[in-house]
Amino acid sequence: MDQELKSSGKCYFCVEVLSQKEIGKHLATHLIAMEKAAIGKKTKSYHHILVEASEMFLHILVDSNAKMKIIDNFLRNIWLECCGHLSNFGHKNFKISMSHSIAEVFVPKVKIYHDYDYGSTTRVELKTVKSYLLPLREPLVLLSRNQPLNLMCATCKKQPAVCLCSVCLYEEFAFFCSECALLHEETCPDFEDYANMPVVNSPRMGVCGYEGGSIDKARDGVYKK
């Protein structure tokens, strides 16, 4: 890939947009303030968890007593689900069950992975940032997600890419705007037949039959200049 992808995310609390490196520390300032303001109130433990796949990321806040299945379902809905494939969490030194609690799995300095589809596998990595005592009711809150990446057309290099060729993608940067996609059809019969897939904000992009998530659709689209 000859493009430099810029990854940034919007803060759930103040909607400020910050870089991938900055957003985590920024969210922490809000969470610390919320925890301090909740002293003396009814609270419960939450884990701030970072999910990453290269330039794509999610910051989520999860009830520490919830089961791992809640994260599996969330990842399927926002990033992964296409054909009902199997999935699992894992770590090189221990096994992780969907019935384990968040607090049992996410301890400091431990990074785990989540695999979706054992054929054409999409793997993401997860780690805990910090835990907080917060006055919330929701079992899971999306704190931030990377904005659509600045994927530009490989042919004209002027317009945002709206589709990709899943066949040519393994050999070249095969992302195209609407007009240049018509030109690619002339040289790639597979593209016209089945390999034309949409650009989406997910590490599952271009794999199997994935066409986008079922939640947070506003940030699942094409980059806008």
Residue ranges of model-derived segments:
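Short linear regulatory motifs enriched in tryptophan with gly/pro/ser
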Residues: 1-225
